């Protein structure tokens, strides 16, 4: 296409060529923003968000302390300091309002899409192909889990730095001056990726694959291998740290739990599953049932995989992108494919975030003969992007809250215990004990040896008054996993409700030896106070405050112990602080009123009892004490 000016003819083709990638990216960004708009109203979910972020006291440290802890501490079977720092900053800025945390995830995903475009364009020089791949990556429903799940910040951050590492490496390869600075930048970005999540641990191998195509520099074998040595050393160090941490926290399945044959079968099935879900992204869920894989099915999958690899190898001269695409997809899945089993999930949507790029690369470059500027082709691409946006927007709604997420998971795969267990937790916290018991029971039907469900049932039965059953579940939880701190805590609570205080204190102490939590400190302090060990009880409550300075229950218990020790002013101060932190804390208001009544300050005591009853109309002690004060006041008036 050309247009004539007064003196010369000016081609408009370059403008058109630049306009198409920009239009594709703009469409994808707008579509992604629309599809994820609802997350601003979403909550934290019970899968990891509570433990990782919302209730993680370590993230509330000052920034220097947060950095120090992130670099040296392990939490939730992970070492990923940059992710912890990111979550800590979010908590400082947004508090426990999930909207801000979700919005940051969406922005990171959008940024990853833009970086992916820049990386692929730098690697291949193909702007339109790169834009199509980046657009499909942005709007694909398989990535909803990585974006709408706050705890998957680690996947987004790791991918951001991983893509930057590849981009810098591509610049290094093609640069004519100051090349080594770009290689150093690539190495630093890789280190940051591993410090966010060891998702990109296979990057050194991926760089060699990219050296084959599109960089076409495999002839310089010695140089290629030498420049990868620092990357390989970082990958080895990260792998060792990950294996140590995962094994120490019991997150890795033993060979006895999952046999090598089963691991290989699951890996072959998972490769097919990820490829299929990229093409047909339906029935996506937060957890999936492990599929039964027969020997015959395993043989078919292995043969299909072998044929595909053979075909890509045979086509390496004419269509080198096929081998690169296959190796990108299959190689980057290795850490999460189940050969080294972490957890019990056979596959997960979030694991496709990086490998899917390889599939998209193969498909889009396989369509390279298309005229991407043709109206029909552009309309088809727009239609595909639109359909994916609609499907993504629908999948995003699944993450609105715990019930939506968990019931959806059960609608996809009924025979998995974790959604039932977490629904039990949700209904217990919302006061629906009957439904909680139902889902805990269903969880044990699916997995009778689920220690976490036995732990939850121990405390629930004890609270409902069936202490014998609660103790039985607590003992079973500990038999199944003796180093589970919450199991010891739940058993201690069951013993406490049964009046077996000495055994309760022992269980709480064992829990604290495994993991020091403020709630368990308060539980043991409460038992010690009931046994008149006031000084040790006070020490437990004060230690709970060191762990969580905003723990209202700790202040309330300190006030109670101080009152029993005769220090009424200190008791009042503690109750005041408890009610300032939690204005609807009925027990603290009632205890404060009792101290004031003892001092003869009846009018203020009555006000405290009134506030206690406003917060909890069923608070019997506050009602009785207020009635007593009103009778005293009536008698005085007469």
Which residue stretches match the model-derived regions?
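Conserved alpha-helical positions within TPR/SEL1-like repeat arrays
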Residues: 418-428, 452-462, 486-497, 519-530, ...
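Polytopic membrane enzymes that build or remodel cell-surface glycoconjugates and lipids
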Residues: 2-466, 472, 479, 486, ...
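Structural marker of alpha-solenoid helical repeat scaffolds
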Residues: 412, 446, 480, 513-514, ...
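Terminal, low-structured helical/coil segments at or just beyond the last alpha-helical repeat
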Residues: 598, 606-610, 614-638
